[in-house]
Amino acid sequence: MIFPYTRWTPLSVAEVAALFRDAPFRWGLAGGYAVEQFLGMPIRAHDDIDIVVFRDDQHQLYQWLHAWRLFAADPPGTLRPWNQGEWLAPGIHDIWAYERTAHAWQLQIMLIETDGDMWVSRRHPMIRGLRTDLLVPYHQIPCVRIEVQLLYKAKGNRPKDQLDFQACLPLLTRDASAWLRQALQLAHPEGHAWLALLA
């Protein structure tokens, strides 16, 4: 069943960590919850919860969540069942999921593109890094590295994204700030409001 897109009862961070604790693939918390793990405290409400998995681990992901209902955003903005054995090609980035007995969406999974031992951003092909460097533990939970998470938030620049950026800005290391500035220049050649604050 495809629920209304606004019907969410998201897992908690602890529940996500327990679900994937022994998974045979790398995963990391993403979105606003990843920001809060970096900060070490909650700063706002959340409608959903997101994780990332490398695209080439998708079959292992499917097997790991064999007791769940999985739906691919294909095309983006439209959900359809993700069938067993189906390979989700580039262009299909998001998976929505719920346990078979649930009555609302519980988890969103985003697939990260790879090129050999590198991860590659959808924002710009020159924005990339070692796969081993993308996910880092913040307060014992694997998360998307904060500067990368902020890059993804920069596109929408919604009020919640602005709040997340402002909360993280004083805590960014010099290297993280420099990386984010360079990535924003590539992804937003027309300019971005955050660049002046990262100078």
Predicted regions and their residues:
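Compositionally biased terminal segments of proteins
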Residues: 1-199
